[in-house]
Amino acid sequence: ARLLELRKKIDELSYQYYTLDKPTVTDYEYDMMYRELENIEKAHPDWVTPDSPTQRVGSKISGGFEKYTHDRPMLSLGDVFSDDELREFDQRVRDDLGGEDLEYVVELKIDGLAVNLIYEQGQFIRGVTRGDGVVGEDITNNVRTIRTIPLHIASDSPHIEIRGEVYMPITSFEALNQQRRDDELEPFANPRNAAAGSLRQLDPRITAQRKLAFFAYALGGNSGITIESQEELLQALAQFHFQVNPEYRKFTNIEDVIAFIHSWDDRRDSLPYATDGMVVKVNSFAQQARLGNTVKIPRWAIAYKFPPEQARTKVLDISVSLGRTGVLTPAADLEPVHLAGTTVKRATLHNEDYIKEKDIRIGDTVVIQKAGEIIPEVVRSLPELRDGSEKVFAMPTTCPACGSPVVRRDGEAAWRCTNPDCPAVIGEKIAHFVSRDAMN
C-alpha cells in the first residue's frame, strides 16, 4: 500500500514540478519520498514495474512547443545527502575500475533548467529542453535571446551538441518577482521555476526581458571533437566562448572532494545565482565509458544535495498590505533571524487559506526557510511551544486604508477592497504608472 501511495504522490509532484512549474513541496521533501520508494523497491525487486517513477528518466512534456528527440539521452543524476554516501559512491567507482588511479572534477550544481544546444558547422541551429531525457521541447527562439549563449562557435564540426543549465541570476529573479508582486501576480517560488517559466514563453520578447544566463558543462552527440576529460571539456567550452562556471576543482581522493563541498557551506549564499548542491564526476572520459550508465543515471557521476537551511523565530504580528488591484495580502512580521546569508524580518503568508492551513497564529514559534534558497516562507508552526498567549488571526472586514468593506469572491482566495476610489489603491496605481515597466 505504501509503495502505491508513494508512486502516486511522486507522479503528482513531478507533474506539478516539471510540467506545470508549480512545485507544492520543497526539493528536500520530494527527495526523501523518492528515496523511500527506491529503498522499498531495492528490498523487493519483484515489485518494480515499468511505470514506477524510479524507472522514468524525467518528466512528461507540456504542450505548446514542437518535440525533438535527443541524439543521445540527457540522463539525470543520482542524489546523495551525506558524506558517507559520497564515500560509498567512491568505493563503487574504484571497485568497478579495478582499483586504478582516478580523478574527480567537482562542480557547483546550478539550480536552473537543463538544455541541449545544437550547432552545425559552428552555427547555432536549435535549443531543446531536457524534457523526459529522451524527447524535449524545441525552444530555439527563446534560447536565442540568452546573451551568454553564442550563436556561432569556432568549430567546423558538422554536428556538435553543447549541454548546460539555463538559470536566472538572483538580481534578475528579485526584480522579476517585485514586478510580479506589483502586478498582483503570484511570484515565482525560486529562480529555477522562473527560468523554466521564462524559457516556455510563446513570445521570445518576454524571455528576452527576463535576463537569463547559461553555464555550459557537457557534450551531447558530436562529431570530430577529440576531448579526453571533463576538465579538458570545460576548458574547450570556455574557448568556444561559452560561460563556464569557474568554481570547479579537480581531486584525486574523496576526502578532498568532501572538504571542498563543505567549504561552500558558508559561502554559497554570497553567489549571484542559486545552487542546490555539488556534482562529482569521474574526470577521464575513457573511465566514464567503462563505468557506463543505468537506464536513468550515469554510474560515473553523483549529485550531493545541500540540506535546506532553516531557522526558528517568532511571529510578532501579522500585517496586511494593499496592492493596486485592491487585494489584501497578509505577511508575518518576525523576530529578526539570520537565514541563508540575510536577516529575515518578514515572510509572506499569501492569503487567508494559507494561514488557516498552516495554523499560524500571532505569537507562534515558527520554522522558516527560503523557498529555493531565496524567498522567506513559513514552513510550519510549532504548536507544542504555545503558552496560551497566542492569538488566532482574522482578516480585516474593512480596508485598512479607507475603511470600506472588503469582499472575497467565490472561487478566489483573496480579499479585496470594494472602494474604487481607495487612496491606497490609487497610490499604488500611480506608483506603477510611473515605474520603469509602465510609462517610463
What is the meaning of each model-derived region?
Residues 1-440:
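RNA/tRNA-interacting regions in translation and RNA-turnover enzymes
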